[in-house]
C-alpha cells in the first residue's frame, strides 16, 4: 500500500567538495567551486591501478565523460590514443602529459600515481601554450615522500589478455565457393587454380591464420616502495618492473624503472625537493597502426586457408600454395597465380620484427619559498633529461610462393638526446571575505639537442 505520510527531501551543498583544490598547471590551484573550465579529476588511482590494464592511458578508460581511449592492434608498444572532446593541436593531436609539473616526464608505474587531472578544453589547457592546444592536458601527480614511520609496500598484478571480436576469414571450402560464384556471376570460366578437381590443394583448410598470429598473452606488474620521513625531511624510493606480452605472437614490452623523491624543509620559508627517475624499456614489435597490404593482420585475412605456416618439405615458411615437386608433377602446376601476392603473416611477425631499447634519466630539482606573505609562493624548478635510444630492423629474403622479396636489408640507428628546462613561477592565492583572488606569473626556458647515427645495409651475403 502507498503511504499517506508526506516526506520532505532537502538537498544541501557539499561544501567539502566545493572547497576541493584543483591543480591547473604550473602550480596554480583553484577551488572546485571557482572553476569555469572543464576539468576531470581522478583521485581513486589505487583502485584503478589494480585494473587488468597495461598502460596509464588504458587506466583512464570509462573514468571521465568526454575522454575516449582508442587502442590499435595487438602490439604492446602501441600507445593508446586519448581523445578529449575531439582533436586538434600542434602536438600531433595528442594530449600533453605533465608529470609533477614537467611536460613529457615518464610515469614509471601506475602504482606511483597519486591523482590525475584532465584539462578538457582549450581555455584550461591554454596555460601550456602551443604544446597542447585543443588536444587537452593530462596532469599527473605522483606519490611523494611522507612524514611518519618507515613503510615498505609491494603491489603485484598478474593477468592474461586475449584479442576479441577478430575477423573470421573464410575457410578453404568457402573461399572456393566464393570464387566460383564471383566468376559465375561475371560470366567467366573458373580458373584452374580454383577448380578443386584440377587443383585439390585449394579445397582443404590447413590453417586458421587469425589463430596463428594471435595468442593468449601474459602480463605482470610489480612495484615495491620504501617511505621514510620526519617533520623536516622525507624520502620515497620505488622500484617497478612490467612485462607485457603482446597478443600478437613474438611481441613484447618490458619496463624496469626506479623513482626517487626527496624533500627537505630548511626553515619555515624554504623547502627543496628532488625527483629522480631512471627507466629502461626494451621491446619487440610489429607496426599495426597503419597495417598496409603486407601487414600481419591484413595478411592473415588475405592468406589462403589452404596454405601452411611452414613448408613440410624443409621447415621453411610456407607460401600461398604447395611447393611439393610430386604435386606439381602430378597436377602440372601448383597454381600459385590463383592467390595473388599474399604474404605469410607468421613470417612477418617472427622474422621481420622491430627491436627497440630506450634508457631514460630524468632529474628535477625544485626550490619553494612560501609563507613570507599570506598566499604568496615562489617555485623554481630545473629539469634535466638524458635519453639513449637503439633501434634495429631486419628484413630477410622472402622467397616463398606469394609475394617474394629477393633483397634483404637491415637498418640500425642510435641516438643520444639531452634536454633541460627551467621554470620560475610566482603564484598568489588568497581569500578576502567572499572574494578569492588568484594570480600567476611564470617564465620558462628550455633546450633540446639530439645526435645520432643511422646505417642501412642491403643485399647482404649472409643472414
Predicted regions and their residues:
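Short, small/polar-rich motifs associated with maturation and membrane association
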Residues: 1-259, 264-275, 279, 288, ...
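Surface-exposed loop/interface segments of Gram-negative outer-membrane beta-barrel transport/assembly proteins
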Residues: 17, 33, 147-206, 246-251, ...
Amino acid at each position: 500500500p502507498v503511504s499517506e505520510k508526506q516526506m520532505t527531501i532537502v538537498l544541501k551543498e557539499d561544501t567539502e567538495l566545493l572547497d576541493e583544490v584543483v591543480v591547473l598547471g604550473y602550480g596554480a590551484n583553484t577551488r572546485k567551486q571557482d572553476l569555469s573550465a572543464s576539468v576531470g579529476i581522478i583521485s581513486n588511482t589505487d583502485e584503478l591501478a589494480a585494473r587488468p590494464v597495461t598502460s596509464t592511458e588504458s587506466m583512464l578508460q570509462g573514468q571521465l565523460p568526454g575522454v575516449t581511449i582508442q587502442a590499435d592492434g595487438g602490439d604492446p608498444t602501441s600507445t593508446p590514443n586519448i581523445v578529449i572532446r575531439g582533436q586538434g593541436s600542434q602536438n600531433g593531436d595528442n594530449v600533453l602529459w605533465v608529470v609533477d609539473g614537467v611536460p613529457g616526464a615518464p610515469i614509471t608505474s601506475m602504482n606511483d600515481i597519486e591523482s590525475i587531472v584532465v584539462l578538457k578544453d582549450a581555455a584550461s589547457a591554454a596555460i601550456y601554450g602551443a604544446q597542447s592546444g585543443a588536444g587537452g592536458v593530462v596532469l599527473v601527480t605522483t606519490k611523494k615522500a611522507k612524514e611518519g614511520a618507515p613503510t615498505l609496500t609491494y603491489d603485484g598484478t598478474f593477468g592474461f589478455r586475449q584479442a576479441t571480436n577478430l575477423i573470421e576469414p573464410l575457410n578453404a571450402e568457402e573461399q572456393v565457393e566464393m570464387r566460383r560464384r564471383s566468376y559465375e556471376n561475371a560470366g567467366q570460366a573458373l580458373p584452374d587454380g580454383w577448380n578443386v578437381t584440377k587443383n585439390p590443394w585449394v579445397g582443404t583448410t590447413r590453417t586458421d591464420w587469425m589463430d596463428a598470429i594471435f595468442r593468449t598473452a601474459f602480463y605482470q606488474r610489480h612495484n615495491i616502495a620504501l617511505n621514510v620521513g620526519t617533520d623536516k625531511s622525507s624520502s620515497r624510493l620505488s622500484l617497478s618492473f612490467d612485462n607485457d606480452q603482446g597478443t600478437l605472437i613474438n611481441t613484447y614490452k618490458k619496463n624496469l624503472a626506479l623513482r626517487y623523491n626527496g624533500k627537505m624543509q630548511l626553515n619555515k620559508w624554504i623547502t627543496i625537493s628532488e625527483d629522480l627517475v631512471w627507466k629502461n624499456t626494451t621491446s619487440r614489435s610489429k607496426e599495426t597502426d597503419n597495417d598496409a597490404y603486407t601487414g600481419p593482420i591484413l595478411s592473415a585475412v588475405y592468406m589462403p586457408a589452404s596454405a601452411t605456416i611452414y613448408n613440410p618439405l624443409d621447415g621453411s615458411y610456407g607460401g600461398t600454395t604447395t611447393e611439393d615437386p610430386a604435386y606439381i608433377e602430378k597436377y602440372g602446376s601448383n597454381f600459385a597465380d590463383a592467390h595473388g601476392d599474399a604474404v605469410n603473416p607468421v613470417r612477418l611477425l617472427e622474422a621481420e620484427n622491430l627491436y627497440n631499447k630506450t634508457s631514460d634519466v630524468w632529474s628535477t630539482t625544485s626550490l619553494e619559498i612560501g609563507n613570507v606573505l599570506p598566499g604568496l609562493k615562489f617555485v623554481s624548478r630545473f629539469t634535466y633529461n638524458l635519453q639513449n635510444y637503439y633501434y634495429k630492423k631486419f628484413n630477410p629474403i622472402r622467397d616463398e610462393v606469394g609475394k617474394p622479396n629477393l633483397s634483404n636489408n637491415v637498418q640500425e640507428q642510435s641516438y643520444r638526446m639531452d634536454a633541460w628546462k627551467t621554470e620560475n613561477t610566482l603564484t598568489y592565492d588568497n581569500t578576502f571575505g567572499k572574494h578569492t583572488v588568484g594570480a600567476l606569473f611564470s617564465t620558462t626556458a628550455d633546450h633540446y639537442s639530439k645526435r645520432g647515427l643511422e646505417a642501412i645495409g642491403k643485399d647482404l651475403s649472409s643472414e
